[in-house]
């Protein structure tokens, strides 16, 4: 039923301007629509490939301890390097089942890195080698 539908990640943020700077300027997403005239909160939509990332102001911003959005890229090393040059900091993990090297973990054919937006929402960058 939904296999041909376009997917959208919806991310709560506390400050729409900071979110627009992070997702637009730092991550390089194209701002598609910004709504500052909504009665309860402001929101913005960014294009990412065939999908959409929506950020909206909410008191629930940054409360998830799990990944809220992920981006699949062809070359994770180049992407992480470019994002770092734009000021994005990547998480480092050193746990028995998850250890990053230069901010990137390799699990089978999956390579992934995680960063946080200004509210602490976790964003994943990933690529598959196989």
Where are these predicted regions, by residue range?
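N-terminal beta-strand motif that seeds the catalytic metal site of vicinal oxygen chelate
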Residues: 1-20, 66-71, 126-130
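Vicinal oxygen chelate
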Residues: 2, 71, 81-130
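Core segments of cupin and vicinal oxygen chelate
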Residues: 3-4, 10-53
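Short, conserved charged micro-motifs
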Residues: 18, 76-80
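Residue-level structural signal for beta-strand termini and adjacent loop
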Residues: 37, 58-59, 128
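Short acidic/glycine-enriched loop/turn segments that link adjacent beta-strands
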Residues: 38-42, 63-64, 98-99, 108-109
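Short hydrophobic/aromatic beta-strand element in the GNAT-like acyltransferase core
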Residues: 43, 52, 70, 112-113
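Short, charge-rich, low-complexity interaction segments located
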Residues: 55-57, 67
């Amino acid at each position: 039923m939904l296999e041909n539908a376009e997917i959208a990640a919806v991310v709560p943020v506390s400050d729409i301007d900071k979110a627009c700077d992070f997702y637009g300027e730092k991550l390089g997403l194209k701002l598609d629509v910004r709504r500052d005239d909504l009665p309860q909160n402001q929101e913005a939509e960014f294009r990412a490939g065939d999908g959409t990332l929506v950020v909206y102001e909410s008191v629930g911003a940054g409360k998830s301890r799990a990944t809220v959005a992920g981006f699949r890229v062809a070359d994770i090393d180049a992407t992480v390097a470019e994002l770092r040059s734009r000021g994005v900091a990547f998480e480092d993990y050193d746990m028995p089942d998850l250890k990053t090297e230069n901010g990137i973990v390799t699990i089978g054919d999956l390579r992934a890195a995680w960063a946080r937006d200004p509210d602490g929402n976790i964003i994943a960058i990933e690529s598959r080698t196989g």
